[in-house]
């Protein structure tokens, strides 16, 4: 019998214990930061990103399925139709998981994988899909849903000589070339 990690409560079935051991082995072998979650059979894994600093993923081994959930971005301030259309189109190309929203309109990526399908390869693929879903479109989502706020922040920082480091990826879009001064 596979010994359970001491930081994750033991699920109730042999199949669930096997799946939890597989998930734990994959995240440990990959050197990913992880810890036990608040629920039985839950591991909370931090995936480092390039556009989004990090993505925190909840992996919960339940009686029949591995539940996967990760926050992507908060509810857009503007251009809701374009913002959500972009996500829905990405859903068509995304294997295993899908985007969804909560009652506040915040965007998550998630899904459920049957326990019998939980292998090292599948867990690795799921983590890759989560990372691509959260990190890949992050800058486009910011521009679609938060452009006005970003422009105000840029203009404010420029007018005061503040650092633009956190907005540097958007310089080509936000920098005013028309000679206009911030309001």
Language model: regions and residue ranges:
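Short, internal acidic amphipathic alpha-helical interface segments
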Residues: 69-110
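A short beta-strand-loop-alpha-helix capping motif that often carries His-Thr
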Residues: 44, 99-112, 151-156
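Charge-rich, low-complexity N-terminal segments
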Residues: 1-54
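A generic structural motif
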Residues: 72-76, 113-122
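A contiguous, mid-protein "functional segment" used to position or interact
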Residues: 117-157
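Short, surface-exposed charged micro-motifs
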Residues: 33-35, 56-58, 98-100
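Hydrophobic-cavity lipid-handling domains and compact docking modules
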Residues: 41-77
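Short, highly charged C-terminal tails/helix-capping segments
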Residues: 142-183
